[in-house]
Amino acid sequence: MRLDKFLVSTGCCTRSVAKKQVRAGAVTVNGRTPRTSDENVDENNDTVVYCGKTVVYRKYTYIMMNKPEGVVSATEDGRDKTVLDLLPPDVRTKGMFPCGRLDKNTLGLMLLTDNGDLGHRLLAPKSHVTKIYRFRSKFPVSEEEAKRFENGLTLEDGYETKPAGIRLEGDGNQGYITLVEGKYHQIKRMLEALDNKITYLERVSFGPLTLDGELERGEWRYLTDEEIAALEAHA
């Protein structure tokens, strides 16, 4: 495997950054400083140190993104920009997909991976992965309406939602909603069942992952080893 490709696989940098760091002498392979980033390394046996830290090959790529408004949760779209379009070409690995969906105008935490097995396990209905959203609504949500939320609501098509958590803040027109399912436009439709309307929606957690507060809208980072292990355990 090429050294720059190996470095990208570890989640430490993009390919362009890898090339710069190799040229700067910030990378060693088995104690030797390589001249170029296109030389081959053995991903299973060689010891690679990047900027003073030993890095290990990852078979799969895992990315946390702070999804901005107006971007769709899809691998490709003929009309709108997708979450994959926000990644550099060398980071968009074959088979990468958004794990779960956020509506076009919903913001926040999006998990992207090329690990199809893990993704499908996390998205399986029986997994009941908890998702927390920060919301604002047009009208205040009353305590009685909050109880209806927590007991499950009947949507306009007759679907009975699973019990959902809701924590109200301020005047009751904002707070946090917790779901264990992910039906199409679910929170929007649940508020509409209360004759209310969502004016702002942002996902702040997905299972064991919490949105990194340092990520600006449209920014992304690789998951840490600890976050990957937590996802595996959760699935």
Describe the residue ranges of each PLM region:
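Basic, flexible Lys/Arg- and Gly-enriched helix-loop patches that mediate nucleic-acid binding at interfaces
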Residues: 1-235
